[in-house]
């Protein structure tokens, strides 16, 4: 008998089947047995099929096989256990518990396994008290028991104790990538980044060494097409997926979205339909295609429901909506999923999101809600600050560490509320009102990097506080003097403008030279940065705003490489056309006279923009805006601006 290249000779069928199982070719075994016919209904055939379905992660099919075996051999308790185990993996928890209860307590060999499986089912069902009760009945000191104790401690937010249990499990049972991942996750919750990365790195290194067939770090074939390795059981047991997702979470938490994407790209290559929920969730958060694509993925996960849908999905889909000002969508999601609101949103997060959504219809009510929340958190911070001082006087290091942790956690909650209150004023161009909010929160937040950055922006936007703004920007630049490219281009541009506006031109030029030198160095390493481009654009726009169009437009043209480089796109073109339109308006009113040579330079610049931007979209559309069927391009807009400049300059020749 020949089956897809597998020769099943008479008298050697069993040997061939077991060799395939040894090679972990479970799908081939399943096809062979089901094609034999009568063998699929025998006890041996069903047992083999159940084993192969389970290891091929087809748990419902495995459960069906073991259910039939329970009927064929009702006295074999192991079949009931395998049946329950398959149901558990398939997420059918209630039925799994029912089957386990049918196994007699007299089955000593299975007692520990049954208790372990029951506690796992209750844990997955979020019945942590029930899981703890069963855990107390199990043999103590084993690797499995220590790991499960750690899981329950982790769930109770006792992360330090959880780390100790997980590490004890590793000592007793040797290295286990899934237990090592648990240690990393507990360190992650304790904000111990270095320790978490150590464990994830070890998991990945062992995975690369032991499982080259998974193609870790090789998302794409040499021909450029995606190559899927599927979801073999070895990938699940290697901890690779969990470790790289945690690494991505660490990078994302640090604000390094590119690093998070790189970590996800190192995952074994799979088709999107094959991705596990956690990977799909993290890819949604870092989707380069924008918020709409990410929201689609999160909405799909939300429809899956528990236990497949990660519990963070609901909060993240709402936060992404608010970040991209899709407030109506956020309100609809909250209204449609009231059950998830109470289950997955803390009272704090619900109140914050509710205030942001309310701000779209009633600013006064939103400010009142945020004010109440801010007052409550400020009171808590003062109380915790006093506690820290009291504990410091006792020299109890453990108590001091706990008190500082509580204070930092409260500060993490307070900061977004401060930003939300300032944002309400900011969006109405009430920068003085936003500054008042920063003054009122300085007591707690003045040392926070995010707070200082945004305080600098608020002062900068007022137009007469450039010295004060520079005082906030300068420490950020000094802190990253060894890698100035890691500083936001907006900060560098605003600091340059602040120097220019306070007659510190030498400092501005020195900063621009540093940026140019660093950008050239990074460019030689194959990395592309647009920091200098953005700085020149902002500085050029500033001079244009001061009616010095000759110098301002020269700066802008230099920033965009004369309009002939890869830096010409909708974002940068916006600065160009605003300044050109300002120039045209001034010329039309006869307030501005541009020298002949300057006009020729601007015309040449627009001609380059016309040629190189012929097919580049000229406008940016938000997630809620409909993109026209034939959107305007930079080339078309540049041609119109060039025509207007020719008319106003009374030139007939290009």
UniProtKB/Swiss-Prot annotation:
Keywords: Cell projection, Cilium, Cilium biogenesis/degradation, Repeat, TPR repeat. It is found in: Cell projection, Cilium. It comes from the Eukaryota. One of its GO terms (cellular component) is cilium. The keyword Repeat applies. Its main location: other. The keyword Amino-acid biosynthesis does not apply. Pfam families: TPR_16, TPR_2. InterPro entries: TPR-like_helical_dom_sf, TPR_2, TPR_rpt, TT30. TPR repeats lie at residues 10-43, 44-76, 143-176, 178-210, 384-417, 449-483, 533-566. GO terms for molecular function: intraciliary transport particle B binding. Transmembrane segments: none annotated. Required for polyglutamylation of axonemal tubulin in sensory cilia. Plays a role in anterograde intraflagellar transport (IFT), the process by which cilia precursors are transported from the base of the cilium to the site of their incorporation at the tip. This is Tetratricopeptide repeat protein 30 homolog. It comes from Drosophila pseudoobscura pseudoobscura (Fruit fly).
